[in-house]
Swiss-Prot record:
Signal peptide: none annotated. It comes from Rhodopseudomonas palustris (strain BisB5). This is Large ribosomal subunit protein bL28. Belongs to the bacterial ribosomal protein bL28 family. One of its GO terms (biological process) is translation. InterPro entries: Ribosomal_bL28, Ribosomal_bL28/bL31-like_sf, Ribosomal_bL28_bact-type, Ribosomal_bL28_sf. It holds the Pfam family Ribosomal_L28. One of its GO terms (molecular function) is structural constituent of ribosome. Transmembrane segments: none annotated. One of its GO terms (cellular component) is cytosolic large ribosomal subunit. PANTHER family: 39S RIBOSOMAL PROTEIN L28, MITOCHONDRIAL (PTHR13528), LARGE RIBOSOMAL SUBUNIT PROTEIN BL28M (PTHR13528:SF2). The keyword Ribosomal protein applies.
Length: 101
């Protein structure tokens, strides 16, 4: 399992740990990832993703998973999240036609 957010592509960064005597040693800054189950309104089912806490805040700010994925570019999404975005778009495209009938 990679240490990368499935929604924002936030990953591991490298840098230096600097001691009191200014000796620099390499270190890794790991993203704060959590396993979360989102409810998709369009799909009508729960979706489990591994996301950063920053992404959780962004999803909440945009009004849910469906709204977040609608605005996100496919390039920054994981394959699983990109497939979800396509499925949600397909489902929403089919809704107006079903309502008009």
């Amino acid at each position: 399992m990679s240490r990368r957010c499935e929604l924002t592509a936030k990953g591991v960064q490298t840098g230096h740990k600097v001691s009191h005597s200014n000796i620099k040693t390499k270190r890794r800054f790991l993203p704060n990832l959590v396993n979360v189950t989102f409810l998709s309104d369009a799909l009508g089912r729960p979706v489990r993703l591994r996301v950063s806490t920053n992404a959780l805040k962004s999803v909440d700010h945009r009004g849910g998973l469906d709204a977040f994925l609608a605005k996100a570019s496919i390039a920054e999404l994981s394959p699983k999240a990109a497939e979800l975005k396509r499925a949600i778009a397909k489902k929403k495209a089919g809704e107006p036609a079903a309502a008009a009938s």
